Amino acid sequence: MENTEKGTIIAISMAAFLFVVVSLSIIGYLISFTKREFKPRFINKKILIILFTVLGINLPIVILGFLFQFVINLSSTAPLIIMIVLAFGLTVGVGIYIFLFLQLIAVGIDEKEIAFLGERILIRKITRVERNDKTNQLVIYYIEGSRSKKKCRFSLASQAGQFMFNNVNLLNQEIMPFVDGQAEPELKVSEQENSEAPVSEPKEDEKTKKD
């Protein structure tokens, strides 16, 4: 029983800690974002309301979990386990959504970068902007670091996508049509250039040695 109680306490504490970390991270990034001066700025209030509503639902669940553990003596641990699973599920769900769809929550553009909540794309690192009519997406190709090639997709059906579409001129780019497999020829050319090596010089050396 002692091991079970310790495990339950650890699980509740982890759920509460995760809830606090995710909530404070969103609030901190949002405050930092709103303090900056962008030429145009977009904040999807509907998504933020949904995210904070889910986190708000999670708060009483965590509190009930602590009450069931320390105040209310339950004959069965099933309600407590359900509370812990719900707390983890809701918080992790919010975290996954932010990780996958960060660019849909808030976007700001200044003379140097495209800024999101805690992330950014340097404008000087953007190599191409494409419109893919098949997927109805705006795709921004950019370089992260020195060599890492990445892309950021915006659905043109979303408000963030329309925001980026209307402000592409601030990126010093023009919207190009999507070309399937465009990167492959470039790689082949570079590979061919790297593979070409002078082979005539050794032969000339051999002839001079014979003479």
Curated annotation (Swiss-Prot):
Region feature (Disordered): 187-211
Biased composition (Basic and acidic residues): 201-211
Full protein name: Uncharacterized 23.8 kDa protein in tsf 3'region
Organism: Spiroplasma citri
